[in-house]
Amino acid sequence: MASVVPLKEKKLLEVKLGELPSWILMRDFTPSGIAGAFQRGYYRYYNKYVNVKKGSIAGLSMVLAAYVFLNYCRSYKELKHERLRKYH
Amino acid sequence: MNENLFTSFTTPVILGLPLVTLIVLFPSLLFPTSNRLVSNRFVTLQQWMLQLVSKQMMSIHNSKGQTWTLMLMSLILFIGSTNLLGLLPHSFTPTTQLSMNLGMAIPLWAGAVITGFRNKTKASLAHFLPQGTPTPLIPMLVIIETISLFIQPMALAVRLTANITAGHLLIHLIGGATLALMSISTTTALITFTILILLTILEFAVAMIQAYVFTLLVSLYLHDNT
């Protein structure tokens, strides 16, 4: 029984390591494809952590923590100079 | 230290692209909509809060003024959430930029005033002269009232900018002072740290109060003119 699933329809965890570059290149990089990816990601997070019967503060805090982290990455260049070192 | 203090207020640009657009749009992610009657806790809390605020703020208006409800509610949500998000470490607060606050204040104020002039011209012009002024004072008072009318949008914008900027600056300065004092004298550093905690509590309050004040004043200008 040899039912070969075409590369395009495999999920990421089923793709073999050697096939990874071609799998990435086959993804939909059109604007509507990228928008669809963001939408899918948003709803995945929303339905897992916020849109549940007993949602907790964790759903919101993870988003805020990611926001803080991204802002830190953005301003790392200026923050580099404020380390406690003898020579900068 | 001098240059460092104000670099946190520069608009974030990454490789020449305006990152500030993404930062301004970010609070909208935190207010999900739901069409259900009974939604999740997050959305329910927000809807309850919004109902509370809108009832308190829009009850003084007549039916013509209440058409502005959506505008004023989204205004208070935006300013409140942007100010509160700015209290997170390393984040950028769009409301510290005078350009943005002017962009919010001038159209709203102008809309209220022009609505008043178009629909109730005599009553709007009558606002320039308070009741019961002695006759010789009338010309001067009309001039003063005109100036005070035109200063309203400027005051709205500058009030918001100055309050939020000053708060952020104080937090930066006192935080830096606490760090510098830790190696010199721990007791003084502890006192400074207590001041920092109190200041942060104040900033949380100021963030929400400023949003409220901004919206309240716009609604007052609206009330005068509808």
UniProtKB/Swiss-Prot annotation, chain A:
Family as reported in the entry's similarity comment: Belongs to the ATPase F chain family.
Modified residues (N6-acetyllysine): 16
Organism whose genome encodes this protein: Bos taurus (Bovine)
Keywords, alphabetical: Acetylation, ATP synthesis, CF(0), Hydrogen ion transport, Ion transport, Membrane, Mitochondrion, Mitochondrion inner membrane, Phosphoprotein, Transmembrane, Transmembrane helix, Transport
Localization, UniProt: Mitochondrion; Mitochondrion inner membrane
List of residues that carry Phosphoserine: 3
Any one GO cellular component localisation term in the record: mitochondrion
Transmembrane domains' residue ranges: 62-79
Gene Ontology terms describing biological process: proton motive force-driven mitochondrial ATP synthesis; proton transmembrane transport
Membrane disposition: Single-pass membrane protein
Keyword match Amino-acid biosynthesis: no
Name of the protein: ATP synthase F(0) complex subunit f, mitochondrial
Superkingdom classification of source: Eukaryota
Annotated function: Subunit f, of the mitochondrial membrane ATP synthase complex (F(1)F(0) ATP synthase or Complex V) that produces ATP from ADP in the presence of a proton gradient across the membrane which is generated by electron transport complexes of the respiratory chain. ATP synthase complex consist of a soluble F(1) head domain - the catalytic core - and a membrane F(1) domain - the membrane proton channel. These two domains are linked by a central stalk rotating inside the F(1) region and a stationary peripheral stalk.
Modified residues (N-acetylalanine): 2
Quaternary structure (record): Component of the ATP synthase complex composed at least of ATP5F1A/subunit alpha, ATP5F1B/subunit beta, ATP5MC1/subunit c (homooctomer), MT-ATP6/subunit a, MT-ATP8/subunit 8, ATP5ME/subunit e, ATP5MF/subunit f, ATP5MG/subunit g, ATP5MK/subunit k, ATP5MJ/subunit j, ATP5F1C/subunit gamma, ATP5F1D/subunit delta, ATP5F1E/subunit epsilon, ATP5PF/subunit F6, ATP5PB/subunit b, ATP5PD/subunit d, ATP5PO/subunit OSCP.
